[in-house]
Amino acid sequence: MATIKDIARLSGYSIGTVSRVINSHPDVSEAAKRKIEEVIRKTGFQPNSNAKLLKQASTSAITILVKGTKNIFLETILEEIQELLRIHGEAVSVVFLDELADEVETAVQLCAERKPKGFIFLGANPDYLKKSFGVITVPAVLVSGDADGLGFENLSSFCTDDFAAAKEAVGYLLSKGHTKIGIVGGMGEREHGNVGADRLYGAMEKLKESGISFERERCYEPAKFSAEAGYDSARRLLERAPEITAVFALSDTVAIGAMRAAKDLGLSIPDDLSVIGFDGIEYSRYSVPRLTTVEQSSSLLAQRSVEDLLLRLNYPRPAVHEKIPFRIVEGESVKKPKK
């Protein structure tokens, strides 16, 4: 039986693009859509156990809500989760939402309209969970976000310790001699459990512990987790604070945009500016220069979330909350600053 990787290989498009076509994502060119759908027809590929492309949430399916339409890391997890659920014979539906949308309110509406058997949230805002999740009674999992402490017995969570990982990323830059560090990404939230907030405040905490002054208004620029937003925000940051010698991007997609912005401003990476990202997406291994990043395991996040959800669907048990390991992967985008 053909797999999503076979479709990517035969069509010449990335797995992420294939996944977007399968899930009726709007951000795909017509040429890519036609080619991928042609390969799907020729191979007889079956995206789920019902052997059909689900274009909207269906009754009794496990529904996956993806927060952000251009977050490559979440799309990678999505692909792995879909494959695992397919193996277990589960029907799956996917809903893509804007990064600022209320994903929990969407889930509540789906409960009323289509009665899904369970939810997987790929990213979520803790404020939205606190406000509305209490009316959801089916088992659910939050991936890449921390629901520990929210008190919902039917909501598990699996994530990296974003606060600790961000501290380690900034510590890595400090170990190379950087003290003039800028931060790009997230929306500047203060709520614990929000990925962007935990990474931002982890980075700021490490600078504080190291005795490094950090002027947030000058050295931090918010951005959605996309390359385009990373480019725009990094450009604003570097034009405002040209003394910066290193940038910590709160996601790899933001980092890739930031590197392009630096290039367009006449800066060489890593000679003039060092950049470290977060996530460890596949593209980070092929950027020029190769991106140094905090790597978290998309496969482990997918595996644990699916295992937990399926177990709780069949055997009622309390929610669990786990942190998965992370590590710094050294690429070519960081070096000591010029004297």
Write out the residue ranges for each language-model feature:
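N-terminal helix-turn-helix DNA-binding module of bacterial transcription factors
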Residues: 1-59, 73, 338
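Alpha-helical recognition/docking segments in bacterial nutrient-uptake
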Residues: 2-5, 57-171
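Short beta-strand segments enriched in small/hydrophobic residues
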Residues: 17-19, 54-70, 172, 180-189
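Hinge/beta->alpha junction and helix N-cap segments in small-molecule ligand-binding domains
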Residues: 67-76, 94-102, 158-168, 184-233, ...
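Periplasmic-binding protein-like
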Residues: 115-123, 182-185, 220, 241-251, ...
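Short acidic capping loops at alpha-helix termini that bridge into adjacent secondary structure
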Residues: 180, 214-218, 269-274
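Flexible loop/turn connectors
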Residues: 234-339
